Swiss-Prot record:
There is a cross-link at residues 72, 129, 197 (Glycyl lysine isopeptide (Lys-Gly) (interchain with G-Cter in SUMO2)). Arg-345 is dimethylated, probably to asymmetric dimethylarginine. Methylated by PRMT1, in an insulin-dependent manner. The PRMT1-mediated methylation regulates tyrosine phosphorylation. Residues 11-20, 27-42 have a biased composition (Low complexity). Its main location: nucleus. The gene is HNRNPD. This is Heterogeneous nuclear ribonucleoprotein D0.
């Protein structure tokens, strides 16, 4: 089997300038990445930014620790990948053998990582996630054990410290559980577009549960965007096959909206399949890319990463400040006020972030 490559974050320095956050160690994921680019790429970099499923994942992957053969154990045990059923079973088994390691010191090397975790069992392979521009460690990596029992031993130990820093090992298989995404953000929508027209268009993809039409709290007029929640996840997948949709007389930009809980899960563990993984897998089977979705872990405000999950700027020029905990979008209408009032039909209120 060929090695699956862990890509880098994309141009972290450029993203920092684009989003307008502080310099230094803040290299978080940039929400200004378009959904289309996100589906075709991996995780992006930017200061204090959220993610719309990532940015570029690839970059300079030849640096130390940028590659890992996620299928080594399968080959060592004499397995073949002759059928989709076997492929899925083998992938599920490998989930039991691998771990995500967060909170690493910037000085921790691949050798340090392997030496430490070898105390718990044979390490088949490991990697550190590196910034493709600077070559600097991004503070997390992955370990593949020979046996799942080694993972259990790691988890049984209450605290792990490497190079003087408490680290955070997690089971990689935890990434498999995720809530379905049923909500979208529609930008570039004319405030004059009737709700009936919006419902008619998007109802063609599946049953609409609710439509939120944000109002300007000063003018009491509708803003140039809305949120739509569907009964099921499938309509969202269909809609996201195109970045732009013509709704009434408006050419609208569509992005996936997520609850805070969904967003945090996506940032830490990523999505297997669905929107972000769609372009990365091979055929109908699960992707072999270990790093799929993990690369934005550092955006969780964890340890030295220091990136709070709120207050992200930039999402194609949308500003959700004050809109009932919807944030991370930037300013679509170039107005400074929050959104306050919302005209809503059915459903329940929640706090959402971009995907």
């Amino acid at each position: 089997m060929s090695e699956e490559q862990f890509g880098g974050d994309g141009a972290a320095a450029a993203a920092t300038a684009a989003v307008g956050g502080s310099a230094g160690e803040q290299e978080g994921a940039m929400v200004a990445a378009t959904q289309g680019a996100a589906a075709a790429a991996g995780s992006g970099a930017g200061t204090g930014g959220g993610t719309a499923s990532g940015g570029t994942e690839g970059g300079s992957a030849e640096s130390e620790g940028a590659k890992i053969d996620a299928s080594k154990n399968e080959e060592d045990e004499g397995h073949s990948n002759s059928s989709p059923r076997h492929s899925e079973a083998a992938t599920a088994q490998r989930e039991e053998w691998k771990m995500f390691i967060g909170g690493l010191s910037w000085d921790t090397t691949k050798k340090d990582l392997k030496d430490y975790f070898s105390k718990f069992g044979e390490v088949v392979d490991c990697t550190l996630k590196l910034d493709p521009i600077t070559g600097r460690s991004r503070g997390f990596g992955f370990v593949l054990f020979k046996e799942s029992e080694s993972v259990d031993k790691v988890m049984d130990q209450k605290e792990h410290k490497l190079n003087g820093k408490v680290i955070d090992p997690k089971r990689a298989k935890a990434m498999k559980t995720k809530e379905p995404v049923k909500k979208i953000f529609v930008g570039g929508l004319s405030p004059d577009t009737p709700e009936e027209k919006i419902r008619e268009y998007f109802g063609g993809f599946g049953e609409v549960e609710s439509i939120e039409l944000p109002m300007d709290n000063k003018t009491n007029k509708r803003r140039g965007f809305c949120f739509i929640t569907f009964k099921e996840e499938e309509p969202v997948k269909k809609i996201m096959e195109k970045k732009y949709h013509n709704v009434g007389l408006s050419k609208c930009e569509i992005k996936v909206a997520m609850s805070k809980e969904q967003y945090q899960q996506q940032q830490q563990w990523g999505s297997r399949g669905g929107f972000a993984g769609r372009a990365r897998g091979r055929g109908g089977g699960p992707s072999q890319n270990w790093n799929q979705g993990y690369s934005n872990y550092w955006n969780q405000g964890y340890g030295n990463y220091g990136y709070n999950s709120q207050g992200y700027g930039g999402y194609g020029g949308y500003d959700y400040t004050g809109y009932n905990n919807y944030y991370g979008y930037g300013d679509y209408s170039n107005q400074q006020s929050g959104y306050g009032k919302v005209s809503r039909r059915g459903g329940h209120q929640n706090s959402y972030k971009p995907y």
